[in-house]
Amino acid sequence: MITPASPEDLRIIAAQLGRVPRGVLGVAARCGDCGASSGASPASHEGGISADRQRGISAGHQAVNPVGYPSDNPVGRLTDFPAGQGDSVPAGHPAVIASAPRLPGGEPFPTFYYLTCPAAVAAVSHLEANGVMREAEALLEANPQIATAYARAHELYIRQRTQAGEAAGIGEVPEIAGVSAGGMPRRVKCFHALLGHALAVGRGVNPIGDWVLDRLAELPASDPHRWTPATCAWKLDETAWEGDL
C-alpha cells in the first residue's frame, strides 16, 4: 500500500536518485517490508491504497488526501499527512515510490511505481545487460496464462495510477491514457518498472515482475547481483545528499 513519505524518506529518496525527487505521492514499497516478499494478497492492494483510505475516497473525503497531495494543489508541492491520519510507516528504506501522473513541471509521467533502491536497480540492470529480458519475452509469448495475467496487470496499473491522480487532485492526464509501464500489456521493455510494480502490489498480480524477483533471488548467495527486499544490503551514505529538498 502507499504510505506517506516522511521528510527522512524524501532525504533518502534524494540520495538514492542523486536528485530532488519530484511528484512523490508516497512510498509504495520498502526493503524489508515489501508486499512481494510477505505473501500479501493482491486484493489487499487494490488501488495501491489501504481499505480505510479506499472508503475515504469513495465517500468523497478530501480533508486527508490518501496519497499526500492536498486537493487544492494539483501538481506539485510535497506535503505530509496530518498527524495520526496516515497508515503507520513500516521499517526499511524506500524501495519503490508512487509518482504523480503529472510532475510538478507539468510533464506527464506514466511510471506510477518507480524503483528507487540502488541495490535493486543495479541487480535488475545486470539482468537486462545479460539478455535475460529475451527470456521474459519468450515466456510471455509461449504461455497464454501469463500473457492474460500480464494484460490484467497493465489494466490494474492504469487504474491505480488514475485513482491516485484523482485522489491527489491532479485530474486526467490524456497524454498517457492507455499507457502503463515496462512494456505492458504485450512486451517486456523494462525490468525496473515491472519489478517496481511487483514489489508495490505483491505477488500474483504482475507475472513478469514476480519472475524477475525470483530470478534475482535464485542467484547464488555469493553473487553480488543477488537481491531480495528482505535481504537488501543497501545503506544510506550520509554524505550522498546534502542539498535542500
Language model region names:
Residues 1-39, 91-245:
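Preference for intrinsically disordered or flexible, low-complexity segments
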Residues 40-44, 48-88:
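Intrinsically disordered, low-complexity tandem-repeat regions
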